[in-house]
């Protein structure tokens, strides 16, 4: 089996991932959906043979010792790929992810223009949140590329794994991958300050130690970007608090009120053409939000966001309403993805009743721009 052929096909089809497992055909993932490449399952031993052909002399014994391995490969006319090799049911399995060098712009992704202001802020903490596969990495890469193309500085990323390769433009971009460029995530964080960064990207916050490091970077005059697994802005604050004991919550909220710059929440919805589009919720740390954080009134953040459209904030349901009214997505798709299905349904009914009020969400008058690079 010529793995190079399949990797080139993966690139041609703009697939994000490829799956190789014994007993099943090769699958590729495009726009979040799996497609088989043929009908014949891979025979026993085939995936192991392919995996070992991609490893160097040191990686083979490492895999046999640890039973899992991460590595990066480059294939002419196909590009760069991240390969995860593992054991399953006594056989070897592989997942190959494309590492893209072409980074879509904020405009191409139809992201809120306020993100350009957010990424250009000199200091503070910016969180991009959403579920796995919601396009967080793509949006972050787009934001970083905007800053890289606009101003000078040193951008340092700590990722597991690297998903987009950034070129040096106006800024210097150093990308460190856990397992390849550093042995451990926390080791890289501890040494980050010695590398004189202006912007630090933390691939994902999973514990209190990483959260404390992110806040510390922001406190010391850096712009810190990070991702979290949460569904919306107020849930993000609750998730952060849950990293810490209750006795520390007041101090954490004070630190967030002083250092948080914004929370961008994202989920993907299906457009009329079947492509996945980002629906975004934007929280900006305005004086009103800062005061709510200080007082611990997290439950009031959603209402404050919905009342602050002119400051660049927007809730998920407002974004979904706007996209549906512009014909970008179906109403049922908007309702499916809504935080409050009943609340959004009521908003649709009121808008269809012809109240005569100006619709503050209808700024998709010409529909969403064509997205060449999907999530």
Locations of regions flagged by a protein language model:
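Short, flexible helix-loop junctions that flank or precede catalytic/ligand sites
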Residues: 1-375
């Amino acid at each position: 089996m010529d793995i190079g052929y399949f990797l080139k096909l993966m690139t041609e089809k703009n697939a994000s991932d490829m799956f190789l497992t014994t007993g099943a055909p090769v699958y590729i993932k495009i726009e979040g959906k799996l497609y088989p490449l043929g009908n014949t399952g891979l025979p026993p031993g085939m995936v192991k043979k392919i995996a070992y052909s991609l490893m160097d002399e040191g990686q083979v014994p490492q895999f046999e010792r640890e039973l899992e391995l991460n590595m990066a490969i480059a294939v002419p006319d196909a590009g760069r790929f991240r390969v995860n090799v593992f054991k399953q049911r006594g056989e070897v399995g592989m997942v190959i992810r494309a590492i893209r060098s072409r980074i879509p712009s904020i405009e191409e992704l139809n992201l809120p223009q306020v993100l350009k202001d957010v990424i250009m802020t000199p200091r503070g903490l910016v969180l991009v949140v959403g579920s796995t596969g919601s396009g967080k990495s793509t949006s972050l890469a787009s934001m970083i590329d905007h800053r890289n193309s606009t101003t000078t500085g040193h951008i340092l990323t700590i990722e597991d794994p690297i998903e987009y390769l950034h070129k040096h433009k106006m800024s210097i971009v150093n990308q460190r991958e856990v397992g390849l460029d550093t042995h451990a995530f926390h080791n890289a964080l501890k040494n980050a300050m010695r590398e004189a960064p202006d912007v630090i990207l933390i691939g994902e916050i999973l514990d209190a130690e990483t959260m404390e490091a992110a806040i510390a970077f922001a406190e010391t005059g850096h712009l810190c970007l990070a991702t979290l697994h949460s569904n919306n802005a107020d849930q993000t604050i609750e998730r952060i608090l849950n990293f810490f004991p209750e006795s520390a919550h007041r101090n954490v909220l004070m630190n967030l009120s002083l250092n948080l710059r914004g929370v961008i929440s994202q989920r993907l919805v299906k457009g009329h053409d079947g492509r996945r589009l980002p629906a975004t919720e934007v929280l900006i740390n305005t004086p009103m939000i800062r005061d709510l954080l200080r007082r611990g009134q997290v439950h009031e953040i959603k209402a404050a966001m919905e009342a602050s459209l002119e400051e660049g904030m927007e809730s998920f349901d407002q974004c979904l309403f706007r996209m549906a009214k512009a014909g970008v997505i179906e109403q049922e798709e908007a309702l499916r993805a809504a935080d409050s299905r009943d609340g959004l349904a009521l908003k649709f009914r009121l808008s269809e009743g012809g109240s005569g009020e100006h619709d503050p969400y209808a700024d998709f008058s010409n529909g969403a721009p064509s997205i060449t690079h999907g999530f």
